[in-house]
From Swiss-Prot:
Region of interest called Disordered, as start-end residue ranges on this chain: 859-878
Name of the protein described by the UniProt record: Alanine--tRNA ligase
Species in which this protein is naturally found: Bradyrhizobium sp. (strain BTAi1 / ATCC BAA-1182)
Main localization category: cytoplasm
Gene3D superfamilies reported in the protein's UniProt record: 2.40.30.130, 3.10.310.40, 3.30.54.20, 6.10.250.550, Bira Bifunctional Protein, Domain 2, Threonyl-trna Synthetase, Chain A, domain 2
Record keywords, A-Z: Aminoacyl-tRNA synthetase, ATP-binding, Cytoplasm, Ligase, Metal-binding, Nucleotide-binding, Protein biosynthesis, RNA-binding, tRNA-binding, Zinc
GO terms assigned for molecular function: alanine-tRNA ligase activity; aminoacyl-tRNA deacylase activity; ATP binding; tRNA binding; zinc ion binding
Length: 896
């Protein structure tokens, strides 16, 4: 047994043969668990099973769980690449018993696997137990035959596990492998335990107590088992390696990186190769599970991981994006075990490529500032934390990247001042929000929800109903009544008004009764499920307890229904055209338009957009039934219902299905689910049949942020008006161009080509005129004179663009052979650009950047940039062109 894939299969198959259900790895983004940023252990997906909240159809399970540790207390990021066993991404092998077997069976199964299936020598294995766990101590003697000297009692948290301050807990027992006396270190619990001789390969947790407040522990009625073995560690032991990065999986990835960068895997660039290999896995798996790089939350952690790898790619000498070229090597190694990698391969590649392209610009700016600010520091010094925060806040340079860049020079970052700067910014944001008046208003809803309970929503079945006023709120405080002309928020015991959520806007309408009439302009959901109606009393006085007739604006609701159903259809159509990686990132469903944001790394072509629109309208024309049903969350997921990424769902969810499950094979759209063509978890309102949408017209496609695209669309009458408007524009264009509508594109293309030709001719004419008749500094007809022993060509020209100024300078340098060329171009808006060129033989004496900065200052500008042989700048005052040329001449004189 040698390969990682074989080791993983052996583990899972062993436990399957012993009555365990092989459960697929859960996503890296924990479902319905706000306490965790990422899945970081095998037991995470079984948390509710262990606590009794959730029931599963099995009592024994085994998994190979994807895990990421790169944030919070489990942050291994800084160590990755520099140690033998730190990773941001790793796989946790595990077996679990939910009130079935306990200690004896757990130890027996573990010992049988490591000694029989894995073939590890018994004399190389040592076990630890919690200090007072006599039962486990005796079982290791009985089952494994270990001598007491190799069953070590350990006190403290290392051998006692707790889910939290309260809840299930219990002692642990760990299996260690002894690498032999050639490696420094001592057994667990000894003074030399920090050495690498004894390596933990498996941790068995015996959940046998419930921790209560006050430190009391009661025995659990059904003790359980939770075990975890790091696959990379196990593979290293089985492959005879002392370093996780020497196992077959990492060797293959590092070889792929080395082939592209010509780096030596055993040379001084070893750490960079390892960083990239590790971070490639973390980045790719996070993207495949729906996380995209951003500046907050999980997306920011992903961006930090990606950018750290990209920084090391730059250290290896990569001059163009590298990471995306390595995804194929990763899918070859891990795609069979994790097919989601293969499904999302295109998204992973494009996301990595775009992020690295952007980051290279950030890296250049950030490193330049870092070099400047740390130029006077020496080994052992501290880098200013405020500057580190500026790099983070202004330039997108993560703190760990700053630390990493300074690490090789022995310079540390003042993290305390960095944290202070971060907190000052957060305090400003909190103060701004609190001072906006929103804080007081928001604070009223949670106590009301506790007092009144949830509002019963009737809007799926009806748009008219009766309701009683249970609370009135004005200016953030509860009131007894609202008079005519006053506006406020109204809470009812039940309502047909939909509260804004899931991207769908809130309903509007009218409430009336006993001389009172209220115009409702918005409906919102607060504190989870408290429906709050925003409105103005038009007649009478509205009082607490009033009975009202409630009527939603039917026409507006109808338009919203059509637009909401259209978003579902467009979502599935986008998946059909662009790939399975398409996942919703947000939406807006209003009566007059819809907006849909989704994960996709690049713009959608006109052809792709047309296909999406065609598929969507095929489903509309089918006039298929739209069905809704309530289902258990797990049943809905197993049935293939799509969920909004990051949304929290209860145990029971509403599933909306539309489109025929079995479609005509000649149709543009193909079946995606037995329940329907589009199947999503959704709490919004929808049409009865897809034909009620009428027509879907996509009006725009754009970028929202890195890796997130947006389409906007119209339905029904809005779509028809849009189509008619476009046709009118096409007819008007055809009339203006004296051609037919069908020939308009070809006619425009011909005109654009003619325009390009004329622009080229005009540019050439301007350049000839500029070099032949522009004003020359010093009055020389040719503009060439000698300054400080070198030839200087200095001219001011009119109407020449910056790109043309550069070509003029290049041509003039060739003509001069040796010398300096300076050309100032005055634009029509009064501004000026200046380009300075220095021939190669003179760059040791004259720097084009320094010369151009002197000119820029004369023009009222600041700075300038380029290379020693060619630089450019600009300024707002083109009337000072001659002064700019004189400044260059003076600078040459001083330098000469």
């Amino acid at each position: 047994m040698s390969g990682v894939n074989e080791i993983r299969s052996t583990f899972l198959n062993f436990f399957a043969a012993n009555g365990h259900e092989i459960v697929p790895s859960s996503p890296l983004v924990p479902r319905n668990d706000p306490t965790l940023m990422f899945t970081n252990a095998g037991m995470v997906q079984f948390k509710n099973v262990f606590t009794g909240v959730e029931k599963r159809p099995y009592h024994r399970a085994t998994t190979s769980q994807k895990c990421v540790r790169a944030g919070g207390k489990h942050n291994d990021l800084d160590n990755v690449g520099y140690t033998a066993r730190h990773h941001t991404f790793f796989e946790m092998l595990g077996n679990f018993s939910f009130g079935d077997y306990f200690k004896e069976n757990a130890i027996e199964l573990a010992w049988k696997l490591v000694t029989k299936e894995f073939g590890l020598p018994k004399d190389k294995l040592t076990a630890t137990v919690y200090i007072d766990d006599d039962e486990a101590f005796g079982l290791w003697k009985k089952i494994a035959g270990l001598p007491e000297s190799r069953i070590i009692r350990i006190a403290g948290s290392d051998n006692f596990w707790q889910m939290g301050d309260t809840g299930p807990c219990g002692p642990c027992s760990e299996i260690f492998y002894d690498h032999g006396d050639k490696v420094w270190g001592g057994p667990p619990g000894s003074p030399e335990a920090d050495g690498d001789r004894f390596i933990e390969i498996w941790n068995l947790v015996f959940m046998q107590y419930e921790q209560l407040e006050g430190g009391v522990r009661n025995p659990l009625p059904k003790p359980s088992i939770d075990t975890g073995a790091g696959l990379e560690r196990v593979a290293a032991v089985l492959q005879g390696k002392h370093d996780n990065y020497d196992i077959d999986l990492f060797v293959a990835l590092i070889r792929a990186i080395a082939d592209l960068t010509n780096a030596d895997p055993q040379g001084p660039q070893k750490a960079s190769l390892r960083v990239i290999a590790d971070h490639l896995r973390a980045s790719s798996f996070l993207i495949s599970d729906g996380v995209l790089p951003s500046n907050e939350g999980r997306g920011y952690v992903l961006r930090r991981i990606m950018r750290r790898a990209m920084r090391h790619a730059q250290l290896l000498g990569a001059r163009e994006p590298l990471m995306h070229k390595l995804v194929g090597a990763l899918t070859r190694e891990m795609g069979q075990a994790y097919p989601e990698l293969i499904r999302a391969e295109a998204l992973i590649k494009e996301t990595l490529r775009l992020e690295e392209t952007r980051f290279r610009k950030t890296l250049e700016r950030g490193l330049a500032i870092l070099d400047e600010k740390s130029s006077t520091l020496k080994k052992g010094d501290m880098f200013d934390g405020d500057v580190a925060f500026t790099l983070y806040d202004t330039y997108g340079f993560p703190l760990d990247l700053t630390q990493d860049a300074l690490k090789s020079r022995g310079i540390s970052v003042d993290q305390a001042s960095f944290t202070d700067a971060m907190e000052r910014q957060r305090a400003k944001a909190r103060a701004a929000w609190a001072g906006s008046g929103e804080a007081a208003t928001e604070n009223v809803w949670f106590p009301l929800r506790e007092k009144l309970g949830a509002t019963e929503f009737l809007g799926y079945e009806t748009e008219t109903a009766e309701g009683a006023v249970t609370a009135l709120v004005k200016d953030g405080a509860e009131v007894e009544g609202l008079k005519a002309g006053e506006s406020g928020a109204i809470v009812l015991n039940q309502t047909p008004f939909y509260g804004e959520s899931g991207g769908q806007v809130g309903d509007t309408g009218v409430m009336s009764g006993d001389g009172v009439r209220v115009r409702i302009t918005d409906t919102q959901k607060k504190a989870g499920d408290l429906f709050v109606h925003i409105g103005t009393v038009e007649q009478g006085t509205l009082k607490l307890g009033a009975a009202l007739q409630l009527e939603v604006d039917h026409g507006r609701r109808s338009a919203i229904r059509a637009n909401h159903s259209a978003t579902h259809i467009l979502h599935e159509a986008l998946r059909q055209v662009l790939g399975d990686h398409i996942a919703q990132r947000g939406s807006l469903v209003s009566p007059d338009r819809l907006r849909f944001d989704f994960a996709h790394p690049k713009p959608i072509s006109a052809e792709e957009l047309a296909r999406v629109e065609d598929i969507a309208n095929d489903v509309v024309l089918e006039n298929a039934e739209v069905t809704t049903r309530l289902m258990a969350l797990d049943d809905a997921r197993e049935a293939g219902a799509r969920a909004l990424f990051g949304e929290k769902y209860g145990d029971e969810v509403r599933v909306v299905s539309m489109g025929n499950a079995a479609r005509d094979q000649a149709s543009n759209a193909q079946a995606s689910n037995a329940m329907g063509w589009s199947v999503e978890l959704c709490g919004g309102t929808h049409v009865k049949r897809t034909g009620d949408i009428g027509l879907i017209a996509v009006t725009s496609e754009s970028a929202v942020s890195s890796g997130v695209r947006r389409i906007e669309a119209l339905t029904a009458r809005g779509a028809r008006a849009h189509a008619n408007h476009n046709l009118s524009l096409a007819k008007a264009a055809a009339a203006e161009l004296r051609t037919t509508v069908d020939e308009v594109p070809a006619r425009i293309a011909a005109l654009m080509e003619e325009r390009k030709k004329l622009e080229r001719e005009l540019s050439d004419a301007r350049k000839k005129l500029a070099m032949g008749g522009g004003a020359a500094a010093g009055g020389s007809a040719s503009g060439i004179r000698e300054v400080a022993g070198v030839k200087l060509m200095a001219r001011a020209v009119e109407g020449v663009e910056m790109k043309d100024l550069k070509s003029l300078v290049d041509e003039a340098k060739k003509q001069l052979g040796s010398g300096v060329v300076a050309i100032v171009g005055r634009a029509e808006d009064g501004k000026a650009g200046v380009v300075v060129g220095v021939t190669a033989d003179l760059t040791a004496r004259f720097n084009a950047v320094e010369l151009v900065r002197a000119a820029s200052e004369a023009l009222g500008g600041k700075g300038g940039g380029g290379r020693p042989d060619m630089a450019q700048a600009g300024g707002p005052d083109g009337s000072k062109a001659e002064a700019a040329l004189a400044a260059i001449e003076s600078a040459i004189s001083r330098a000469g």
